Amino acid sequence: NQEYVQATVHLQHAEKFTVAGEYVLPMRAVFYDKDGNKHNIAGGEVLIPINVVDIAFANAAATPSGTMIPGSNYQLSLSTPLQYGTIENLTDGDTEQYGYLPHGTSTLTIDLNQTTTVKGIRIGMYILTGFEYYTDKVRVYGSTDGAKWLPLSEDIRLHETTWNNINATKSVNVRYLKLEFSVSDSYGSLSEIEVFK
C-alpha cells in the first residue's frame, strides 16, 4: 500500500551547498496527530536527491557582449529532427528562415571545435501571426569533452520575441554547449542560434 507524494523541500541552510553536484538528503517521514503529537512513520525513511547547479547563464535584455562566432565555425546537431525547416536555417543569419521543434523536449548540441570562453547565446524565433507556436524554455549545459555535461542554468523562460538573449553571468570555458528546449504546444519556433565569445 505504498503511495507517492510530491513535495517541495525548503532548506534552512541552503548556503551549505557550495559545490555544484548531486546530493542525497536522508529524511524521515513523520505525521502529527490531532493533538499535535509527532509520530515516526514505520518504514518512512526517505532519500531526497538534490542537484545543485552553479548558475552561469541567465535571460537578459541586452545582446551578449563580445564577438559573435560565425555559424560556419561550429557544428549543430539535434536530438530530434525539426518538424519544418532544416538545421542549416539555424545559422544562416535570417530569422525568417525557421524550423519547428516538436512537442516535448529536444536537445541542440553545439560543437565549438575548441574550448572557448562563451559570453552568451542568442536564440531567434520566427514570429508569425496566426501561427503562434513558440518554444517555452531552455536549459543550458556545457562540456569540455562532449561526454560529461554540467548544468549551467536553470530553466530559462523564452519570450515570444524575435530574439532572446542569454548572457553568461560568470566565466564559462567549454567546447560543447547543449541547449535543452521544452515545447508545450504542438510545435516550437526556432530560427537562429548565435554564440558569442
Per-region residue spans from a language model:
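Interdomain boundary/hinge segments at the C-termini of tandem beta-sandwich modules
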Residues: 48-54, 195-197
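Extracellular Ig-like/FN3 beta-sandwich strand-entry sites
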Residues: 4, 20-24, 172-174
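Trp- and acidic/polar-enriched beta-sheet ligand-binding modules for extracellular glycan
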Residues: 103-105, 130-197
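Beta-sandwich strand segments
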Residues: 34-45
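A short beta-strand element within beta-rich, extracytoplasmic domains
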Residues: 116-130, 179
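Aromatic sugar-binding surface patches on proteins
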Residues: 2-10, 162
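Short, surface-exposed loop/turn segments at beta-strand-coil junctions that are enriched for proline
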Residues: 12-20
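Disordered, acidic Ser/Thr/Pro-rich linker "stalks" and the adjacent N-terminal cap
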Residues: 51-113, 126-133
